[in-house]
Amino acid sequence: MLNRFIAFFRSVFLIGLVATAFGALPARAANETAPDYALSMHGDVALPADYTHFPYTNPDAPKKGSLTVGVVGTFDSLNPFVLKSMRTTARGLYNDGEFGNMVYQTLMLRSRDEPFTLYSLLAEKVAIDPERKWVEFTLNPKAKWSDGQPVTVDDVLFTYDILTEKGRPPYNSRMSRVAKIEKTGERSVRFTFNEKSDREFPMLIAGSMPVLPKHAINRDTFGNSTLEPPIGSGPYVVASVQPGQRIVYKRNPDYWGKDLPSQRGFNNFDKISIEYYRNETSLFESFKKGILDIFIEGNPIRWEKLYDFPAVEQGKVIKDTFEKGTPADMLGFVFNTRRPIFADRRVRQALGLLFDFEWANSNLFAGQYRRTQSFWEGAQLSSVGRPADARERELLAPFPGAVREDVMNGTWHPPVTDGSGHDRVPAKKAYDLLSQAGFQFKDGMAIDPTGKPFAFEIMTRSPDEEKIALAYQRNLSRLGIAVEIHTVDDAQYQQRLQTFDYDMILGALASSLSPGNEQWLRWGSASRDVQGSFNFAGVADPAVDAMIEALLAARNRADFVSAVRALDRVLISGDYYVPLYHLPYQWVARWDRIEHPQKTPLSGYQLPAWWHTSQ
């Protein structure tokens, strides 16, 4: 469940990007304005100018066969760039957490084996001002759309205009940081930035802004949902669509970029089918029957006990475990602080004490999960277990009270219960906090300061989410808190999520070694009331804003790490999430006709690099 739930949130996030790039080769130490093949946030890139392929791909992988994958949900649009279809767009078109950019592409491509380094894609060269006040791209002369038309500077200019005017968040809001965009040559375009920009923003333009075909898009209807197969510059085209059921992509045999170093070893399947299911149970049954080629597993009980069918015993189904080097994703119950019942931090802190991880892990998940504590769990960026350093304290000094003392000195951790499901110690602490917040307890009910029974709804979207919500509900009820669990269909869930129409949800945040501008969308005050943003908790805190500004302004690794840890401390102290758990690895089951590279990159397995083995 966990991996698939994370995948849902990944599919709608523009994953953020500030990097502490690592590797061995200086990117542009002598002259940062010289055109080059790569961009990194801080200093170094891992691959030389004459690299032939990413180290986590197989450049000799056969190009053949098909891949059929299942997802839970539905879709009714092929337009991922507008708010109307933001969370009901078919998977795989662009910026997909599992499938990448199959149809639309960006100027540069992110390596998944470095925190944040970009390499040439649509742009064959890049030049950047040392102060990052401008960035200039030279398009690859071979770049073409799937209809054979060349990718031009006019397409880049058009993309900027149309996303500024009609694009969804974050595209429309980000474009306000561009002072001007201009054609500087037949194949070159320069973005000049204004005072709203920061050192990361050129990286977002390079690696996160899609390039759209001017000749194939009607400006008047761009804001509408559509099922018309799009024209893109990517390796695949849409072959067929059954709304809500299936989308099929076929590899473009004339794909212009197939021999680029950044593309070699990817895009190996002739056909990729994404099948939509109502729930994981039916999806798993289809995998067992061989209808689906792979199954991305997130349920420890199923992984341990339900892979006993004949194909596994015969070696036809292989269970793979992948380790990744990025922080664990944050999964947690999210308080919508726009709701008055969750406006008081003491209330949120009290409710956070009432999730019994030890009981849930033992009874529901076979002890496979680990408790998540930090928004950058398991990474150097995490503040947990570390006292704040001098730079952190300097950043936090203007905001007294923003960080609790136990969080500041590194001694805080979520409560550890006796695992019985009846531990009185955290319950007593929660009772005391609620009492301090003005609550009373009468006739087995918690009464809020206005005299009303304390009650709220947890919105879920699957039986697996409902199961963990029920475990939480049981503990909350012991303090007289009335919780209703409401499981809704995918379309309703996405609509309510987009409009912040919920009390509490199970939310997931994809974490990385490169937190950056996406933090504004998750936590920034300006995003609190912007529908379609990812500020699910409704955070609006000057301390949070200041820490985000600090991490974006950091010019060296030490300052960057301190700023991220300071942000981590403020978020933990704000009690916006009840952190749940994570798996320290990734599980994928596959039929033996599917193979993958030996090397797993920093970010974990990469489906676009897998291939079909049968004759």
UniProtKB/Swiss-Prot annotation:
A UniProt-annotated Pfam family: SBP_bac_5
Any single GO BP term: microcin transport
Cell location: Periplasm
InterPro entries per UniProt: Peptide/Ni-bd, SBP_5, SBP_5_dom
Molecular function, one GO term: peptide transmembrane transporter activity
Source organism (scientific name): Brucella abortus (strain 2308)
Keywords, in A-Z order: Periplasm, Signal, Transport
Tagged with keyword Phosphoprotein: no
Family annotation (PANTHER family): ABC TRANSPORTER PERIPLASMIC BINDING PROTEIN, PERIPLASMIC BINDING COMPONENT OF ABC TRANSPORTER
Record's keyword annotation contains Iron-sulfur: no
Signal peptide segment: 1-29
Similarity-based family: Belongs to the bacterial solute-binding protein 5 family.
Record-given protein name: Putative binding protein BAB2_0664
Record-level GO cellular component terms: ATP-binding cassette (ABC) transporter complex; outer membrane-bounded periplasmic space
Chief place of localization: periplasm
